[in-house]
Amino acid sequence: MKYIIMQDVFFIVLLLVLAIPLGIYMYKVMIGERVFLSRVLEPVERFGYRLMGVSEAGMSAKRYAGSVLAFSAIGFVFVMAVLMLQGFLPLNPQGMKGLSFSLAFNTAASFVSNTNWQAYSGESTLSYFSQSVGLTVQNFVSAATGIAVLFAVIRGFIWKKQKTVGNFWQDLFRVTLYILLPLSLVLAILLVSQGVVQSFADYSVVETLENGAKQLIPLGPAASQIAIKQLGTNGGGFFGANSAFPFENPSSFTNLIEMLAILLIPVALVVMFGRAVKDSKQGRAIMTAMMIVFVVGIVAITISEQFAGPSYQGVATSGSMEGKEVRFGVGGSSLFAASTTAASNGAVNAMHDSLTPLGGLVPMFFMQLGEVIFGGVGSGLYGMIGFIILTVFIAGLLVGRTPEYLGKKIEPYDMKMVCLLILVPPLLTLFGTAFAVMMPSVQASVAASGAHGFSEVLYAFTSMGNNNGSAFAGFAADTTFTNMVGALMMLFARFIPLIAALYLAQNMAGKSPVAASSGTLSTKNGMFIGLLIGVVVLVGALSFLPALALGPIADFFTTFK
C-alpha cells in the first residue's frame, strides 16, 4: 500500500510541476501575446485566417454561440457521412462496411460533443480513414471548442462595459495551433517510442503457439489518436479495450504519461485562470477545492480495490484484480479510473464494470458532480465557475448582501444561466436512466441482474449525460434506443451549458467592477474552499443519492452475504 501512496503523490507533484508553466503559456495564447512558438506558427496563423476569411472582430454571445453550433453541425454531418460511407472510402484494408444510421448518429454526436462514448469496437468496425480523418479531427476541434468557450467566459470577468466575448474562429484556431497540435505531436512521438502502434499497414496474421492456429493482429494509426484523446479529454479508444490494450498503453511508463496527459490541460487551465484575473490566489483556491475532492476519490477507490470488501475478509490477496491489467495493478488502475472520470475523459485501463461496488461508485459520482473536478478541457472550469457563483450567491443570502465574484455583482439573470449550467446534466442523466430502465431493449442489454444491473444502466446514462464516455462494459450499448437517446443526451449536455456559459460571460463583460469592501466575501480563503466543496458535493448528493442507493450502494451490501 505504501508504494501505491508514493506513486499517487509522485503523480500529483509531477502533474503540478508540468501544469504551472503550461498554464502561463496558455494565458499568453489567450491574450494574443507572443510565445516561443510564435516565430514558426504566426505565418501559419495569418495564412489560416486569410484562407478562411476570418474577421478578428469581437462577437456577442449570440454570434459566438451560433458559430460554435454551426461549426459543430458541420463536423457532425461530416463524421456521419464518413462513418456511413467508409466502405467506399480509402484506407480501409480490412474492407469495413459503413455503419448503421443509429450507430453513425450516436458516434458523430459522441465525438462532436467531446464525449467519445463508443457503442462499437474500433478494430472490428472502423477503417483507418474513419479513425484518423473522421474521429481524430473531431478530437482536436471539440477540445479546442471547449477551451475557446472558457476563454470567452474568462473575458466576461476581466473585461468591463463590453458587449462582446471574443472571436470564436480566432480562439479556435489559436487553441488548436498553439496548444493542442504541439502537445499532441510531442506525446504521439513519445508513445511511439514506447511501442504504441502507428501504422497504415494491413492487419497482421500470425501463427500462435496453440497448434499453429492463426490470429489476426489489428494495427493502425493509433498513437496519433491516443495523444489527442488523452490531452483533449476525449477518451475514445482506437481499439475496443481502450488503454487496457497493450497497443495503446504497453507499460507502466506509458500509463503514467497517459494519466498526466488526461489531467494536464484541465489543471493548467486553472493556473491560467488565476493569471487572467490577475489574482493567482483565486486560481489556487479553485485548484485546492478540486484537488481535495480528487484525492479523496483516489483514496476511496484504492482502498476499496486493495482490500476488496467483506467477501475477501480473512483472505490474503493483492487486491481485487478482476478486470485489471497485471502490468498496472490496483494502484495504477485506481489512479487511472479516478483521473479519467474526474477529467471527463472516459478512457479506461481496467474494466470499470469489474470494480468493487464502492470502487465503481467513485468514478460514477465524479461524473455526477457535473465533471467539474478538473473536468473536460474548458468545460470543466466553466462548469466549476458556475458552482462558484452558486456558492457566492448562497453565501450572500446567508449574510444579506448582494453577492459578487471578482468584482462583478451576481444578478438574477446570471443565476438563471448558472442554473442551466449546473442542472441540465443531472436532469438528462436521471430522466435518461428512468426512461431506459422501462425499455425492454435496454433491459435485454444489461448483463447483470439486481443492483449491479441497475448500476450498469445508471453508469451508462451518467457517462453520456455528463460527456464522459466511459462505461460499465456489461451494458450492450449498440441498440437503436440507446444510440438515438444517448446521442441527443450527449448533444444537449454539451451545448446547453455551453450556451448558458457564453450568455453568462456576456452579461458579466457588460458590468463595471465594484470595489471590494469589508463585507465582501473572500473567494480565496479556506472557508470559501470548504463552502465550495460542500456545494458541489451537496448538489451531486441531492441529485443522485436515491439512484446511487438503488445501484452501487445496494450492490455493496450484497457483498455481506
Swiss-Prot record:
This protein's membrane topology, according to the annotation, is: Multi-pass membrane protein
Function noted in UniProt = Part of the high-affinity ATP-driven potassium transport (or Kdp) system, which catalyzes the hydrolysis of ATP coupled with the electrogenic transport of potassium into the cytoplasm. This subunit binds the extracellular potassium ions and delivers the ions to the membrane domain of KdpB through an intramembrane tunnel.
Summarize the subunit comment: The system is composed of three essential subunits: KdpA, KdpB and KdpC.
Q: Name one GO cellular component term.
A: plasma membrane
Coiled-coil stretches are: none
Source domain of life is Bacteria
* Presence of the UniProt keyword Oxidoreductase in the record: no
Q: Which GO terms describe its molecular function?
A: P-type potassium transmembrane transporter activity; potassium ion binding
Q: Keywords, A to Z?
A: Cell membrane, Ion transport, Membrane, Potassium, Potassium transport, Transmembrane, Transmembrane helix, Transport
Q: Which family does it belong to?
A: Belongs to the KdpA family.
UniProt organism field: Listeria welshimeri serovar 6b (strain ATCC 35897 / DSM 20650 / CCUG 15529 / CIP 8149 / NCTC 11857 / SLCC 5334 / V8)
Q: State where it is primarily located.
A: membrane
Q: Where in the cell is it found?
A: Cell membrane
Query: What is the protein name for this chain?
Result: Potassium-transporting ATPase potassium-binding subunit
Q: Which residues cross the membrane?
A: 4-24, 65-85, 134-154, 177-197, 253-273, 285-305, 380-400, 417-437, 484-504, 528-548
| A Pfam family matched in the record | KdpA
Q: What PANTHER family has UniProt attached to this entry?
A: POTASSIUM-TRANSPORTING ATPASE A CHAIN, POTASSIUM-TRANSPORTING ATPASE POTASSIUM-BINDING SUBUNIT
Does the keyword Cell membrane feature in the UniProt annotation?
yes
